[in-house]
Amino acid sequence: MTNIRNSHPLVKIVNESFIDLPAPSNISAWWNFGSLLGICLILQILTGLFLAMHYTSDTMTAFSSVTHICRDVNYGWIIRYMHANGASMFFICLFMHVGRGVYYGSYTFSETWNIGILLLFAVMATAFMGYVLPWGQMSFWGATVITNLLSAIPYIGTNLVEWIWGGFSVDKATLTRFFAFHFILPFIISALAAVHLLFLHETGSNNPSGMVSDSDKIPFHPYYTIKDILGLLFLILMLMLLVLFSPDLLGDPDNYIPANPLNTPPHIKPEWYFLFAYAILRSIPNKLGGVLALVLSILILAIIPLLHTSKQRSMMFRPLSQCLFWFLVADLFTLTWIGGQPVEHPFITIGQLASIFYFSILLILMPIFGTIENRLLKW
């Protein structure tokens, strides 16, 4: 009798993706983040579903409905904080996953990489709209400031902003449509993630050495299922430490004040995971230039494969590029810090220097260092 794993049409798909999948024998813990992102997505959909049962997307009742969830709904507080902090864990895993792709040259799988960039944009859009839903001060003003950036687009900008708002300001129509999009986007992300996996399994996984590993593969189960479960335990530990001990650590206190269009907070800023892009936006005095830099700070990932000059795929044996990569990581930490600071001296100058450094590393220095390393190895 044929094993059900190989004969049943549905079970066969699961088997070929998670059980009998041939995986390189040397992939490290950096390859855990793909599965962790899947777990984060499932967690966010489940907690979000339960929150949506009690939330009302109306400007008059949105804030009090979130309060009601935390105070009156059974375990509502833990569901709410798991959802809010789950988003932070999601982005930590995302940044690690993208960083691993850049370090080990996974961007040479062009279809997988490009769908990954689409996924990144979709997750960022979902997180932004989710931040608006509690209808606190930072929700309202964050929505106003970020959507207003689209008015920098020549000719159609103002009409586009009013079309997104559903009126002449951020109001009931905006909140309702943001809730609708925030609800549907995770399911679109799930579909995109399936396509991401489909293309990945066409080529097979990359590995730390960057070399073809077809001659040395092992089955995904039990070796990497056990390894992924360990990563999952760490993820749950970190999330629950955050949720149970300091649930508001990564949030903004201003969001506990109900939205008031007549009172602007002293310092409008997005959630921590957008601060690096926000710092790049603020570092350019021109509005359109800032918006372009903001979009390019993420879209630059699509250009990385075109700028790969090294004869080696991975940075594992390229010490110069390794130094540059960790400079880039330090630069992103600097940008994140600057994004949370007020717009005054010396933060403006530091932000501008960090922004120049960010684009210089990715567009100029990495290709140059790749060529230098080729010359040093006489290739």
Curated annotation (Swiss-Prot):
Transmembrane regions: 33-53, 77-98, 113-133, 178-198, 226-246, 288-308, 320-340, 347-367
Amino acids binding heme b b566: 97, 196
InterPro entries hit by this protein: Cyt_b/b6_C, Cyt_b/b6_C_sf, Cyt_b/b6_N, Cytb/b6-like_sf, Cytochrome_b, Cytochrome_b_C_euk/bac, Cytochrome_b_N_euk/bac, Di-haem_cyt_TM
One biological process term in Gene Ontology: mitochondrial electron transport, ubiquinol to cytochrome c
Cofactor: heme b
Protein's membrane topology: Multi-pass membrane protein
Subcellular location: Mitochondrion inner membrane
Protein's UniProt keywords contain Protein biosynthesis: no
Comment on bound cofactor: Binds 2 heme b groups non-covalently.
UniProt GO MF annotations: metal ion binding; ubiquinol-cytochrome-c reductase activity
UniProt GO cellular component terms: mitochondrial inner membrane; respiratory chain complex III
Keyword Membrane carried by entry: yes
Main localization (coarse): mitochondrion
Subunit structure: The cytochrome bc1 complex contains 11 subunits: 3 respiratory subunits (MT-CYB, CYC1 and UQCRFS1), 2 core proteins (UQCRC1 and UQCRC2) and 6 low-molecular weight proteins (UQCRH/QCR6, UQCRB/QCR7, UQCRQ/QCR8, UQCR10/QCR9, UQCR11/QCR10 and a cleavage product of UQCRFS1). This cytochrome bc1 complex then forms a dimer.
Membership in a protein family: Belongs to the cytochrome b family.
Note from the entry: Heme 1 (or BL or b562) is low-potential and absorbs at about 562 nm, and heme 2 (or BH or b566) is high-potential and absorbs at about 566 nm.
Function: Component of the ubiquinol-cytochrome c reductase complex (complex III or cytochrome b-c1 complex) that is part of the mitochondrial respiratory chain. The b-c1 complex mediates electron transfer from ubiquinol to cytochrome c. Contributes to the generation of a proton gradient across the mitochondrial membrane that is then used for ATP synthesis.
Protein name: Cytochrome b
Species per Swiss-Prot/TrEMBL record: Viverricula indica (Small Indian civet)
